[in-house]
């Protein structure tokens, strides 16, 4: 649904017609990487899970917790693989990321990226509109480091191509 407000609107509309409704209201899904994984496989899985439909999927992972023993290796590979993703027309077979759905979504994503940087995160890749796209709602897939649990990005669903990295012991 994208938000509790939209979920309530959908429920009201369904109630008027006495329709059954099932919703997932902003689960803010975690992606957890323990120290016993194959980093090559898990980074491929992270890319597929996060960037499907440019991160605009309710079940897209939004919080990436990486075991401290695997952080450097995971970070290196996720950044390298993210930089190789092609942005473009979603109907082209060689495109990995199409546009965001609306100008409003793009503006909200830019505000969240700015806020995340101001809160102390470091942008490892992405973090802006692609310079070669003059039209459309395109945004580069972005990986953040030095994110803390109290940052806004950890509480608000980004609904876009953002990966915040945190570590655990």
State what each model feature region is.
Residues 2-148:
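ALDH superfamily catalytic-core signature
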Residues 33, 165-169:
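Short acidic-hydrophobic, aromatic-tinged amphipathic segments that line or gate anion-handling sites
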Residues 157-158:
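Short, surface-exposed loop/turn microsegments at beta-strand edges and helix-strand junctions
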Residues 154:
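Short, solvent-exposed loop/beta-turn-alpha elements that line the ligand-binding surface or hinge
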Residues 161:
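Glycine-rich nucleotide-phosphate-binding loops and adjacent flexible coil segments
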């Amino acid at each position: 649904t994208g938000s509790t407000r939209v979920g309530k609107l959908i429920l009201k509309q369904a109630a008027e017609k006495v329709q059954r409704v099932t919703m997932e209201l902003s689960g803010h899904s975690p992606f957890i990487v323990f120290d016993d994984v194959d980093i090559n496989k898990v980074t491929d899985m992270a890319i597929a899970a996060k960037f499907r439909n440019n991160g605009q999927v309710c079940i897209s992972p939004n919080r990436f917790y990486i075991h401290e023993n695997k952080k450097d290796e995971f970070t290196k590979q996720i950044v390298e693989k993210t930089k190789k993703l092609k942005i473009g027309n979603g109907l082209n077979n060689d495109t990995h990321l199409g546009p965001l759905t609306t100008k409003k979504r793009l503006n909200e994503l830019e505000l969240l990226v700015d806020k995340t940087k101001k809160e102390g995160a470091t942008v490892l890749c992405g973090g802006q509109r692609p310079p070669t796209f003059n039209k459309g709602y395109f945004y580069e897939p972005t990986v953040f480091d030095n994110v803390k649990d109290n940052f806004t990005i950890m509480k608000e669903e980004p609904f876009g191509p953002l990966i915040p990295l945190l570590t655990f012991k």
